[in-house]
Amino acid sequence: MYTQGAFVIALNESQQILLVKRKDVPLWDLPGGRVDPGESAEEAAVREVLEETGYNAALSAKIGVYQRPKFQDEQHLFFGSITGGQAVADGIETAGLKWVSLERLPLFMVPNRKRQINDFKNGAQDVNVTVKDRGLLAAIDLLKRRLGKR
């Protein structure tokens, strides 16, 4: 059975994207996380944004579903906006928050996030993508799964 995740691309008025720094690995990521049993991907995305950032979010479009068969992982990616709340920069899962230009994404990001963000920039809507993980970041992800940190 595939693990389900839900993540949100949220832009501010300056067209900057909201990123969170993870506590489990020193990488930047989109706000999001695991879909709980009985919860829709949309509900999980909104909940995870609040838990990780302190912000309330409203979803406006589904960018797509990204499947990683090697890891039995399926990630739902949404576009949304921040509708309220107060930033929480240091939470249970999050070591920091920042708004960055879509053209100047950090070097150290969770595997495949830049690809997902580029799909968004190129106008992708409701796509289905099968991703093949490569390199060191994929190895980190596999190690985390084996250690039960996901």
Each PLM stretch: what is its role?
Residues 1-17:
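Conserved N-terminal beta-strand and adjoining loop/helix that marks the start
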Residues 67-92, 98, 102, 113-124:
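Active-site-adjacent beta-strand/loop module that shapes the phosphate/pyrophosphate-binding cleft
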Residues 55-64:
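A short coil-to-beta-strand element that immediately follows conserved catalytic motifs
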Residues 118-150:
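Charged phosphate-binding loop/patch that engages nucleotide di/tri-phosphates or the phosphate backbone
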Residues 36-40, 94, 108:
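Residues at secondary-structure transition points
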Residues 10-11, 19, 80, 99:
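Conserved hydrophobic "DFG−1" position in protein kinase catalytic cores
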Residues 12-51:
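Conserved Nudix-box catalytic region and its N-terminal flanking loop in Nudix hydrolases
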